[in-house]
Amino acid sequence: MGYISLALVALLVFFASPVVLADDITPIPADRAQIPQWFMANVKPFSQRRGTLDPELEAAEASRRVIIVNQNGGGDFKTINAAIKSIPLANKNRVIIKLAPGIYHEKVTVDVGRPYVTLLGKPGAETNLTYAGTAAKYGTVESATLIVWATNFLAANLNIINTSPMPKPGTQGQALAMRINGDKAAFYNCRFYGFQDTLCDDRGNHFFKNCYIEGTYDFIFGRGASLYLTTQLHAVGDGLRVIAAHNRQSTTEQNGYSFVHCKVTGVGTGIYLGRAWMSHPKVVYSYTEMSSVVNPSGWQENRVRAHDKTVFYGEYMCTGPGSHKAKRVAHTQDIDNKEASQFLTLGYIKGSKWLLPPPAY
């Protein structure tokens, strides 16, 4: 009996302690109005998360450094690149780069040796990072205005823009706003502008909240394991337009895109929710409002018929005229509560060990 009592006590202590990963299992509410409360309860600031985060991240957050960038002077640096280069390789501290409002015409890379970087714009102000890189000049994934290789990156209140003009049909028109290749990255209130291949959500666990992503074809693509929450997906241009091209290539890969409480908008009609760029894409839309711009078939027909059996295209409790399923392609999955649950918690991106809210400006 003594052994059993100790076991019960241990369990009670575990479930009562702050180490419990409640933020990984509490589902995102179906009511959009409840999301702010849910977020505050499940993504608490560092001061309330000590002892629950990755040890390296805890050490970094405990020793923060702030850099001011103002292109008009009065800060530590006038360019974002200069601020990033001032961070030593093998950095172990959270470095918050506060950006004064303005237009920063730079092609920025956050190297793998510089983790724990935050790019922080001022809420309510216009802070634009712009560049006109193209695939013809740099190659597709290297054309991005912002490239992040480092882990534990965070950005908030930024507009990240590829200013290259809309490509003509049949040209090498890829021009990225961002490529995110680092694990454990979060984006809050960021806007991404481009046309073809706007956002390369490449590899790692990523979180997007209150963002806006605009493009034409495959404007979110890559191999990431990412949760998009309350984010607007806006298609522009005409002709063939596709939102998501996920690059999953086998059932063993633990990745995919989960869009929750998002809005699909755009101009014209016939926009596809996704396509099978590779053999095993995983893309799920939950509680998402789909306007009439969405193609009635939902998803682009697979060019390789064998992929009909390997794609995972899920829709769960979506709304709006574009969510009607009567004409969806046969391999669309109208998933049930149990199946949807895995895409509706922060556990999908293992958030309990690393996800933090944005810092104050």
Curated annotation (Swiss-Prot):
Protein name as annotated: Probable pectinesterase 49
Binding, substrate: 174, 275, 277
Extent of the signal sequence: 1-22
One matching Pfam family: Pectinesterase
Pathway assigned in UniProt: Glycan metabolism; pectin degradation; 2-dehydro-3-deoxy-D-gluconate from pectin: step 1/5
Residues carrying covalently attached carbohydrate according to the record: 128
GO biological process per UniProt: cell wall modification; pectin catabolic process
Gene that encodes the chain: PME49
Tissue expression from the record: Expressed in flower buds.
Stated role: Acts in the modification of cell walls via demethylesterification of cell wall pectin.
Gene3D superfamilies: Single-stranded right-handed beta-helix, Pectin lyase-like
Keywords: Aspartyl esterase, Cell wall, Cell wall biogenesis/degradation, Glycoprotein, Hydrolase, Secreted, Signal
Listed PANTHER family: ACYL-COA THIOESTER HYDROLASE YBHC-RELATED, PECTINESTERASE 49-RELATED
Protein family membership: Belongs to the pectinesterase family.
